[in-house]
Amino acid sequence: MAGLPVDRAQRLLAELDRLRAELNVYRGHLLDVSLDPMGGVALAFADPPGLTRDDVVLPAAVLDRIERHALGVADHRAALLAAGQHLKRGLLLYGPPGTGKTHTTRYLLGQMSGYTRLVLTGRSLLAVGGVTDLARDLLPAVIALEDVDLVAEERSLGPASSPVLFDLLDAMDGAGPDADLLFLLTTNRADLLEPALAARPGRVDVAVEIALPDAPARERLLTLYGQNVPLALTEQDVNLAIERTDGTTASFLKELIRRSVLESLHDDPVLTAVTGAHLARALDDLLDSAQGVTRTLLGVGVDPADLPVGGLLHAGPGPRAWAGSSHRVTRRRFGSSGG
């Protein structure tokens, strides 16, 4: 740009920046974020989850509140701006493990086509600062942060590192109020996040509890998880199962259906029918006193306040699968501010 007047050169640079953001290959896609061994950030394109509202088993009022905050702002963006209302928002889903926070998040991500959706789980949460910078370039955007409590007190990436939770709050502050940017957080330990969020109000606008499923929800979950299974259950079979599974999680009920299928296959290698007897045997096994650890792993009887901070992160598997497939992994190295 040698020889150009300063103002003209600045306009040209601004236009190049605009085109770079507008034509960015990541724009409008669902992206799984991970860290590579060299400290860079890997972005993997993923197929959006094909979930519908009927696939989300929550009380109608709870799901309405979640949709209104996440999707309603997207539907009424122009009207909100015209009325002087901000678009940037934070939504926290909290509750015991296994109740459907991740499933609900996947549903929302699938509904927000046209948004750049960046999903951070596990140690990729350490790069929240840099990922937020990318999201601001690719608005409208969603940053989904799964199980924030697991790394809330860890140090972020970069020489001037700070606890990840404070980096997250700074990132939320850094986005302008008119930015159509949704921060979607999930946690099993709301008690760990609440003091910091309360000290800096306005970052999370809505916190929604995803509680243990009640009796009607448990019935819907059994139907949902058994939709591809040849269930041959009487009304009495279903009612007894609902009664005996009081206090269990969605994860527990999903495993119950799987084990019922295994019980049927044990009787006959050709799967023709899963009966009440199969369901009862599977439930007897899951509720057996020797299966206490199994129930804990399925979120049953777990007090979130008793969960370790960070311990599960280092012992557990890698990032969760957010869609049917991921492909085209590319790498982007962010500056020290965010990793």
Predicted feature residues:
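AAA+ P-loop ATPase mechanoenzymes
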Residues: M1-D75, L87-K88, L93, L108, ...
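Loop/helix-junction capping segments adjacent to catalytic residues or to phosphate/diphosphate-binding pockets
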Residues: V6, Q10, D191, P216, ...
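Long, hydrophobic, amphipathic alpha-helical segments used as structural scaffolds
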Residues: N24-R27, L81, D268
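Short, glycine/charged-rich beta-strand-loop motifs at protein surfaces that mediate ligand recognition
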Residues: A2-G3, E209-I210, I242-E243
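Walker A/P-loop NTP-binding motif of AAA+ ATPase domains
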Residues: R53-N239, G339
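C-terminal alpha-helical "lid" subdomain
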Residues: R200, A215-G339
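Generic structural signal for secondary-structure transition and capping sites
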Residues: A21, D75-A78, D173, P177, ...
